[in-house]
C-alpha cells in the first residue's frame, strides 16, 4: 500500500485527475491524504468535492480555510464573493449530502506508525501533541454538532477583546476560535503564543518581527513530521527537514504537488 500526500487543489479538477493518473492511483492499494483547500478559487470545485466524496474510502482530507468558508456561506453567515468560485457547489442538488460529510471531516490527520501529522496551515510552538489533539477535537465536535451554525457564527464575528495570543486561561469559546484560526490560517508567529493573520508574503519580504511558525522549536516536531498546505508563496523556500509544505500554487498558474511518503518522491502537475 502506497501513501500519498497532496497539497492544495483549489478546485483544479483537471490537474487533480492528472495527478491520480501520474501516481497510478490504485483503489485496492493506495491511500491519499489531502492538506485542505481542495475547493475554492479554481474552476471546478464541485467536481473535485464530488470525486473526493466518491473515493472517501481511499482519499482522506483535513479542513482548510476554504472549506470553512463554504460552511460559512452555506450557513448564510457571510456573503459569497466572486473570487470564492463556490456558487456551483451552493446550487448543487446534492449540497446537503456534501455539507453533511464535509463538516464531519477532521482538522488534522495523524499516522502514529509513520509519524506523520497533516494539517492545513500549521501550529503554534506553545502546543505539544496533547494540546494539538485536544484543541482540534473540540472544534471538530462543534462542527459535527446540530448547533454548528451558531458555533460558526461566533467563529466569524470580529472580536478585538482578545488578541491572537494563546493563553490556557482564555474562555473555551475563544480558545476554539483561536484553534480554528491557527490550524487553518496561520503563517507567521510573533512569539511562541502570538500569531499574525495578516501577512501572506514570502519570509524574505515580511516584517522582521514575524517568524514562520515552523521556524520555532516545538516538541511535536521532535518525533513527527508535519505536512501542510496553505502557503503557496513559500514553494521554493527551504523548510526544516521534517516539515513539508505542499501548496505550490496550482490555482495561481503554479503546480499541484504530491508526496509519496514511502520513498519521499515528489510528483508535480503543472497548472493548465
UniProtKB/Swiss-Prot annotation:
Looking at the Swiss-Prot or TrEMBL record, what is one Pfam family this protein matches? Metallophos
Top-rank taxon of the source lineage equals: Bacteria
A Gene Ontology molecular function term for this protein is: bis(5'-nucleosyl)-tetraphosphatase (symmetrical) activity
Q: Which InterPro entries match?
A: ApaH (IPR004617), Calcineurin-like_PHP_ApaH (IPR004843), Metallo-depent_PP-like (IPR029052)
What's the top EC group for this one? hydrolase
Q: What is its EC number?
A: 3.6.1.41
The entry's keywords: Hydrolase
Q: Which reaction does it catalyse?
A: P(1),P(4)-bis(5'-adenosyl) tetraphosphate + H2O = 2 ADP + 2 H(+)
What exactly does this protein do? Hydrolyzes diadenosine 5',5'''-P1,P4-tetraphosphate to yield ADP.
The family this protein is said to belong to: Belongs to the Ap4A hydrolase family.
Record-given protein name:
Bis(5'-nucleosyl)-tetraphosphatase, symmetrical
Organism per entry:
Wigglesworthia glossinidia brevipalpis
Amino acid at each position: 500500500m502506497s501513501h500519498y500526500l497532496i497539497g492544495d487543489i483549489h478546485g483544479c479538477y483537471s490537474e487533480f485527475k492528472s495527478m491520480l493518473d501520474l501516481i497510478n492511483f490504485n483503489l485496492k492499494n493506495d491511500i491519499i491524504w489531502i492538506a485542505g483547500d481542495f475547493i475554492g478559487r479554481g474552476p471546478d470545485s464541485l467536481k473535485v468535492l464530488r470525486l473526493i466524496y466518491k473515493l472517501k474510502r481511499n482519499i482522506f482530507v483535513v479542513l482548510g480555510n476554504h472549506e470553512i468558508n463554504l460552511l460559512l456561506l452555506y450557513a448564510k453567515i457571510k456573503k459569497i464573493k466572486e473570487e470564492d468560485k463556490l456558487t456551483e457547489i451552493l446550487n448543487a442538488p446534492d449540497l446537503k449530502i456534501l455539507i453533511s460529510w464535509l463538516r464531519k471531516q477532521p482538522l488534522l490527520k495523524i499516522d502514529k506508525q509513520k509519524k506523520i501529522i497533516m494539517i492545513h496551515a500549521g501550529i503554534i510552538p506553545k502546543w505539544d501533541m496533547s494540546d494539538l489533539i485536544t484543541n482540534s477535537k473540540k472544534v471538530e465536535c462543534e462542527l459535527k454538532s446540530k448547533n454548528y451554525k451558531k458555533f460558526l457564527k461566533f467563529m466569524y464575528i470580529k472580536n478585538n477583546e482578545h488578541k491572537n495570543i494563546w493563553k490556557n486561561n482564555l474562555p473555551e469559546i475563544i480558545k476554539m476560535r483561536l484553534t480554528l484560526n491557527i490550524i487553518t490560517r496561520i503563517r507567521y508567529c510573533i512569539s511562541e503564543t502570538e500569531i499574525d493573520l495578516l501577512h501572506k508574503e514570502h519570509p524574505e519580504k515580511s516584517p522582521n518581527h514575524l517568524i514562520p511558525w515552523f521556524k520555532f522549536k516545538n516538541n511535536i516536531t521532535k518525533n513527527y513530521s508535519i505536512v501542510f498546505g496553505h502557503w503557496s508563496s513559500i514553494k521554493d523556500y527551504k523548510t526544516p527537514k521534517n516539515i513539508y509544505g505542499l501548496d505550490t500554487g496550482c490555482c495561481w498558474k503554479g503546480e499541484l504537488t504530491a508526496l509519496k511518503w514511502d520513498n519521499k518522491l515528489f510528483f508535480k502537475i503543472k497548472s493548465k
